[in-house]
């Protein structure tokens, strides 16, 4: 009986991408806490930061004002998205030299399916090492790589030896690795879900696997089924070339109708900042802003505006006020 060979999946994640580009291009920023994102006197957030800034507790999506309080000596710079996009395309060109099965996740990370690549003695680990070396040669930037037999484990592996590191999780190691993995390290499980799982007595992959499909579905809905499969070492998601996030959004439902214009504007402003933070986390940019309002009778009104340049927190808030 013929069986499909185990897949070989590589996850490449650039190291502190936006900040690394700025430190590469501006030597005065090197070896210093550098923050790319909103300025400290704005309501913006940290898009990414250098490892020097991370060492003092600053992280992505943190309000820039808080980052400034933590480290007043930090250097704050606005993102240069056109530059990042150009470099990202250079990196993707490197990927395509090895395989056409490349799934970009954001400007600075991607999955590669190298199952059928015969070079490097059929070793995905040696291949990943060659890819990261070539990226360094062409861009003077470092990347970390995770290698495994599915996307979930490859993603987890790429974070283990950051920065400028590589880690492989073999099929023989996979089940034990997942059993021992703290639930907060599972990709896709954020602080709120982690807290809920802890309340259910789930702290590791092994404890997660003890719950049935029905139990996980009752607590987490459709996502619970994904958790079930991951906990049981089942992740058959294919690498999909050219698949990118097309939109991000947030919404708020009130317990009763509101008409206070100040409250409406404050709420829309908070929702925008939350959506903008998602963009920053995914290292994406947006050109169109949409506001959707649903009334008690379920009538829905939508207003959109497309900007002439990528949306920043200042442009977005101004557009929100205009649309309202």
Named regions from a protein language model:
Residues 1-219, 223-225, 239:
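Gly/Gly-Pro- and Ser/Thr-rich, intrinsically disordered tail segments characteristic of DNA damage-repair
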Residues 4, 11, 185, 193-321:
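DNA-contacting surface of Y-family translesion DNA polymerases
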